[in-house]
């Protein structure tokens, strides 16, 4: 009975979310036990929370609701679902300064149809170029790039837009744009975003320049975290590029700069230990390896190997077999 009721409430909120008011939505939402974190339902919940705060004209509630909604939109894997599209529209109505950030979020997510739809809603003076040119970058990026006689003439925002779009396809071409027009014209945050977005696909494609492109990003991504999609993924792939290069000092720096949650993952605990050991910091390396060497996981076993220890047991025996028992068992074979 509970499962059926939960399923009915969930489907009702998904189908009727846009037709409800804040009070009715909240009534059904509070009745959910397991599905409050469903992406579509979360989007409608954020939508109505913001709507209620605006109706009250409570500025602190509006600020809190906007922050929650922006984080949800940035992190969602379903930005083309109608619920997320409506949420994005409401955020944009409440905060006009977020308009261009929304475009760049969609571009990073490689959601080109939705990017074009949102671009059409922006006031023309806020666009970095005519819509025809922006559509050309989205739909025919290679052809658009061939038509550019001098990349250095591109305005900063247009260069950022084109770099992020083209990085998905050809990181080397995006790097050309970044060197010519992003580096000399854009601020530190946008330079950092562009080079991170170039470094990421370059690493997955095993491009030997990946780590050098990543290095150009610096640390300015932290200046506007709400505009960065999958920041932890970007950091992780930067580390992988350095592992591939055997750049141990650089790897230590990148891992040390990771968010605490990511840095605690055993994969990065292990590689931090490897980096420290390669730099001659044996005591620090052993501390890192020891923290995970008891685990039965892949990296736990690798850490045990580094320490010369036996692997951990998921269900350890009460006592190790004695030699006489081993010999007896061998005699029965």
Task: Label the model's feature ranges.
Residues 1-333:
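Extracytoplasmic and endomembrane cell-envelope/extracellular-matrix remodeling and assembly machinery
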């Amino acid at each position: 009975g509970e499962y059926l009721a939960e399923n009915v409430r969930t489907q009702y909120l998904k189908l009727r979310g846009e037709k409800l008011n804040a009070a009715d939505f909240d009534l059904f939402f509070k009745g959910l036990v397991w599905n409050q974190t469903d992406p579509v339902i979360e989007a409608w919940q954020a939508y109505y929370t913001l709507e209620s705060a605006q109706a009250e004209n409570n500025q602190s509630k509006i600020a809190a609701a906007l922050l929650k909604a922006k984080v949800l939109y940035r992190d969602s894997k379903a930005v083309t679902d109608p619920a997320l599209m409506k949420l994005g529209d409401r955020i944009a109505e409440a905060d006009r300064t977020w308009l261009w950030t929304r475009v760049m979020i969609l571009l990073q997510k490689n959601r080109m149809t939705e990017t074009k739809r949102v671009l059409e809603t922006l006031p023309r003076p806020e666009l970095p170029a005519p819509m025809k040119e922006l559509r050309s970058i989205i739909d025919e990026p290679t052809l658009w790039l061939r038509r550019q006689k001098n990349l250095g003439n591109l305005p900063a925002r247009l260069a950022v837009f084109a770099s992020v779009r083209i990085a998905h396809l050809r990181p080397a071409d995006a790097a050309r744009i970044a060197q010519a027009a992003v580096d000399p014209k854009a601020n530190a945050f946008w330079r950092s975003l562009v080079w991170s977005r170039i470094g990421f696909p370059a690493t997955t494609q095993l491009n030997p320049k990946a780590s050098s492109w990543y290095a150009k990003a610096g640390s300015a991504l932290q200046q506007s975290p709400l505009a960065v999609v999958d920041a932890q993924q970007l950091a992780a792939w930067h580390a992988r590029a350095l592992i591939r290069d055997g750049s141990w000092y650089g790897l230590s720096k990148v891992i040390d700069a990771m968010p605490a949650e990511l840095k605690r993952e055993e994969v990065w605990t292990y590689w931090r230990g490897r980096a420290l050991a390669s730099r001659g910091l044996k005591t620090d390396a052993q501390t890192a390896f020891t923290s995970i060497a008891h685990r039965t996981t892949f990296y736990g076993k690798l850490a045990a190997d580094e320490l010369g220890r036996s692997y951990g047991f998921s269900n350890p025996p009460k006592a190790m077999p004695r030699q006489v028992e081993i010999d007896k068992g061998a005699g029965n074979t």
